[in-house]
């Protein structure tokens, strides 16, 4: 019986390590896909399409000062099926928010300083560090929308 208990304990530890790694990798994958999506879909506007992001982005607004906000809101709507791997009842993608608290784990946050969009995620706890300075953070840098 003791052997079964030991094997069960080892199995639980291994399983927890596996699920933790899977969640971390899911956040990384979601983050990468969001960045690619923004770049590819805004390129449609640059090349003359009238809409992008499944019709959520009106390319005719490209010259407006708040274009980055239109883009971020369109991304949030078009990718609303992305779920936070750490809490699948919640959407993963938000325009706004931060990645510096443990509550931010698993979210993909878009910020729009200047004429750019910044995409950042906390892939595992602890998240509480200066933004984009921890190995637990994935940050895209700035995606230029012009």
Residues covered by each model-derived region:
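Periplasmic/extracellular, small/polar-rich flexible segments of pilin-like filament-forming proteins
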Residues: 43-146
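Compositionally biased, intrinsically disordered low-complexity regions enriched in proline and serine
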Residues: 16-19, 38, 87, 108
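Intrinsic disorder/low-complexity signature
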Residues: 13, 27-30, 36, 55, ...
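Membrane-proximal N-terminal amphipathic helix
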Residues: 20-49
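N-terminal single-pass transmembrane signal-anchor helix
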Residues: 1-19
């Amino acid at each position: 019986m003791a052997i079964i208990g030991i094997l069960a304990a080892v199995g639980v530890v291994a399983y927890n390590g596996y699920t933790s790694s899977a969640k971390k990798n899911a956040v990384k994958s979601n983050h990468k896909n969001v960045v690619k999506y923004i770049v590819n879909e805004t390129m449609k506007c640059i090349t003359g399409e009238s809409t992008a992001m499944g019709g959520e982005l009106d390319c005719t607004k490209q010259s407006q000062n708040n274009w980055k906000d239109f883009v971020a809101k369109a991304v949030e709507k078009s990718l609303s099926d992305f779920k936070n791997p750490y809490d699948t009842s919640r959407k993963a993608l938000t325009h706004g928010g931060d990645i510096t608290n443990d509550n931010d784990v698993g979210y993909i946050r878009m910020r729009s300083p200047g004429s750019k969009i910044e995409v950042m995620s906390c892939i595992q706890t602890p998240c509480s560090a200066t933004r984009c300075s921890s190995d637990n953070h994935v940050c895209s840098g700035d995606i230029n929308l012009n």
